[in-house]
Swiss-Prot record:
GO terms for molecular function: laminin binding; magnesium ion binding; phosphopyruvate hydratase activity. It comes from the Bacteria. This is Enolase 3. It comes from Lactobacillus johnsonii (strain CNCM I-12250 / La1 / NCC 533). Catalyzes the reversible conversion of 2-phosphoglycerate (2-PG) into phosphoenolpyruvate (PEP). It is essential for the degradation of carbohydrates via glycolysis. PANTHER family: ENOLASE. GO terms for biological process: glycolytic process. (2R)-2-phosphoglycerate binds at residues 163, 338, 367-368, 389. Keywords: Cytoplasm, Glycolysis, Lyase, Magnesium, Metal-binding, Secreted. CDD domains: enolase. Belongs to the enolase family. The active site is at residues 205, 338. It catalyses: (2R)-2-phosphoglycerate = phosphoenolpyruvate + H2O. The keyword Transport does not apply.
Amino acid sequence: MLKSVIENVHALEIFDSRGNPTVEVFVTLSNGVVGKAEVPSGASTGENEAVELRDGGSRLGGKGVMNAVNNVNTEINDALKGLDPHDQPNIDATMIALDGTPNKGRLGANAILGVSMATAAAAAKDNHQPLYRYLGGTDLEMPQTFHNVINGGEHADNGIDIQEFMITPVAKTSFRDGFEKIVNVYHTLKKVLEDMGYETGLGDEGGFAPNMKNSEEALKALHESIIKAGYKPGEDIAIACDCAASYFYNKEDGKYHLEGKVLTDEELADYYDKLLDEFPELISMEDPYDENDVEGMVKFTQSHKDRIQIVLDDFICTNPKLLNKAIHEGAGNASLIKLNQIGTVTETLETIRLSRKNGYNTMISHRSGETGDTFIADFAVAVNGGQLKTGAPARSERVEKYNRLLEIEEELGKGERLAFFPDNVDLD
């Protein structure tokens, strides 16, 4: 039987959950098998992320992606024809070399990632395997999910500076059991917010976007909702935050402008300590300091690494070189993993391996501009990612991922392994 090879790579411009253009890619093999991928995009982006190629000009507010689409349909298609779709490292290395820039800025990370993901999808189909099995083999684990149920910062038009307030099921008997707990708290939260006099419109990631005064009020609403839903804060459901501190850091004075206050590194740490003392169920903080504030991040890690999970997002941008630097500096104890920050499946896997080797947890993540593509659900299971965040249990582009995880759990059958976090954090 002849080995299948890539016959054609084709892209077109589609739209994401924010109504912005993005790239969809189809990889067709010589035996007729087709793999498809849709590329997400972020609103809160790190300085060191791989570059999305946007068209500029007046069409679609300058956000069109026809140049990226054309790059797929011409240069990338020509370069990949005849290659083995099962050799993912070679596919990705070929595109990186073809691009020739350190940030994928010539062809576009949105073009390259779409092809990388679609190739993996095609190869899995060619093997008659689900994507999670093709990428991950047999020793698989269902991830613990983190759900952004109150949106602030760049993800909502309200007065909260911290970007995401998440809930996570720390006690569960199955993925479905944990997800049902989250759904119960989510619906309870809506009623709690209404009783507090807030509107319950949704932000980009399906969470509510109430115009609250400060982050403490958001945490109080979550705490109350967990209890009213019939659960114990910290024992059944815990809380996590994405601070996205780069968005309230002022480069001119080197201080953090947060909720009407101007704070130094030390004062910001005191502010976080106040929240942690008041809400011991708060177990994880993402990007608590600006992506260039190495001193602040390292000091906070030294003083808090045994108390909470400190997740690096903008600080490392899923880049193994930046992660290696953070490891040597002693920053953080967990890595946020976003495929489109680095731009290929292979490089994403490299960052995950480096994280594991150095004792860092990993949290696979969606972006605020999403599509119905469920690649990251399979990916999180395949790499035993441990943790996954992909929004609230609302808006179809978010729920599609959770529904895919429910399908995967059913396919794995009884006895599937569950990721649990925290296992090193004292919640008493």
